[in-house]
Amino acid sequence: MNITQIIEKLKQNEVVAYPTEAVFGLGCNPFSQSAVEKLLILKQRPREKGLILVAPKLDYFFSFIDKEQINSQHWQKLQQTYPRPITWIVPAKKDIAKFLCGNFNSIAIRVSQHPAIKILCEQTGFALTSTSANLSGIAPCKTSDEVRLQFGADFPVLDMSVGSATKPSEIRDLFTNQLVRQG
């Protein structure tokens, strides 16, 4: 599908596949419980685990993160450019929907410069949920053709290339810098 069709699907609270820095991600509108529920069912992902949000700028995350708990050093860390993609675990707003953060009082966010993420967020006006495009036990998809093989020929997938990263993003706690997932 082209970018316009994918944007329409996202606005209609559908789940789509789009390229990220290393693999294809499955994403949807994080403000829509029905969209997130579809994503969790499709991915067979336990609700308790929570989801990652991606966007080209921090502003897209302000509806989800507790800005009061983040000091100037933490903001610098979030705004810094790194040689590889880093997902940060940050404090979530107290009223955040549990379908996004699972059993946690935090949420994972990643500022991404991938052109697809930039265009999709700018055109929809929201961050995207991001979980790797693969069924349980199968390697994440690196091409749109692989997505169609796993999820069906009619699955809405953006026909663009993934970035140059060879591994999915590492995940770190913003406050402790503890490595949660190796990238």
UniProtKB/Swiss-Prot annotation:
Main subcellular location of this protein, as a coarse class: cytoplasm
Matching SUPFAM superfamilies: YrdC/RibB
**One cellular-component annotation, GO:** cytoplasm
Q: Where does this one sit in the cell?
A: Cytoplasm
Assigned EC number: 2.7.7.87
The EC category is transferase
Task: Tell me what reaction this enzyme catalyses.
Answer: L-threonine + hydrogencarbonate + ATP = L-threonylcarbamoyladenylate + diphosphate + H2O
A single GO molecular-function term is: ATP binding
Q: Which segments constitute the YrdC-like domain?
A: 1-183
> What are the alphabetically sorted keywords of the record?
ATP-binding, Cytoplasm, Nucleotide-binding, Nucleotidyltransferase, Transferase, tRNA processing
Q: Which domain of life is it from?
A: Bacteria
Q: Biological process GO terms, please?
A: regulation of translational fidelity; tRNA threonylcarbamoyladenosine modification
Give the matching Pfam families. Sua5_yciO_yrdC
The UniProt function text for this chain reads: Required for the formation of a threonylcarbamoyl group on adenosine at position 37 (t(6)A37) in tRNAs that read codons beginning with adenine. Catalyzes the conversion of L-threonine, HCO(3)(-)/CO(2) and ATP to give threonylcarbamoyl-AMP (TC-AMP) as the acyladenylate intermediate, with the release of diphosphate.
Please report which protein family the annotation says this sequence is part of. Belongs to the SUA5 family. TsaC subfamily.
Q: Which protein is depicted?
A: Threonylcarbamoyl-AMP synthase
> Can you name the source organism?
Histophilus somni (strain 2336) (Haemophilus somnus)
Name the gene behind this protein: tsaC
